[in-house]
């Protein structure tokens, strides 16, 4: 599958990654809430999408550490809230944050943050003092799995 066809804008506020079997919210918390979020806010953001049944689904969650980097490609660029390049596919909405929060590290009071300007991970101290953005995701069958 060519990289050009990997991400599909579903026209319902979601983007499907056909290679990884993931459906992403097209916007992030910065687009939707107009503010930075801490870990609790990001979990609440995903929960609110479930309560609204965003795009007809109620299994939205924060991405894992590994899932965070799957939407990053240095050759792609759209503008973040500050007019700087973030390296995600053009199917995603511009104007969002430049970092994404992952789900909490199991058994620890920490999380991963992925910078979509630089492609680098960080594991900052303090779940409740973070100031990042969140993007929700859900797992779907891969296109190849449906055949």
Question: What are the roles of these predicted feature ranges?
Answer:
Residues 14-18, 27, 64, 70, ...:
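Residue-identity detector for threonine
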Residues 1-55, 60, 131-137, 144:
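Extracellular adhesion/carbohydrate-recognition regions
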Residues 43, 47-57, 65-117:
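An exposed tryptophan-centered "aromatic clamp" motif
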């Amino acid at each position: 599958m060519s990289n050009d066809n990997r991400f599909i804008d579903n026209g319902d506020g979601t983007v499907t990654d056909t290679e990884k079997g993931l459906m992403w919210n097209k916007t992030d918390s910065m687009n939707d809430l107009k503010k930075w979020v801490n870990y609790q806010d990001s979990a609440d953001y995903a929960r609110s999408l479930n309560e609204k049944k965003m795009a007809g689904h109620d299994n939205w969650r924060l991405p894992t550490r590994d899932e965070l980097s799957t939407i990053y490609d240095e050759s792609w660029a759209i503008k973040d809230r500050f007019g700087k390049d973030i390296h995600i596919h053009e199917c995603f909405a511009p104007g969002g944050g430049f970092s994404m929060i992952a789900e909490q590290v199991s058994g620890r009071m920490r999380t991963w943050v992925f910078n979509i300007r630089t492609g680098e991970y960080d594991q900052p101290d303090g779940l409740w003092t973070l100031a990042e953005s969140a993007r929700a995701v859900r797992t779907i069958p891969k296109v190849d799995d449906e055949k």
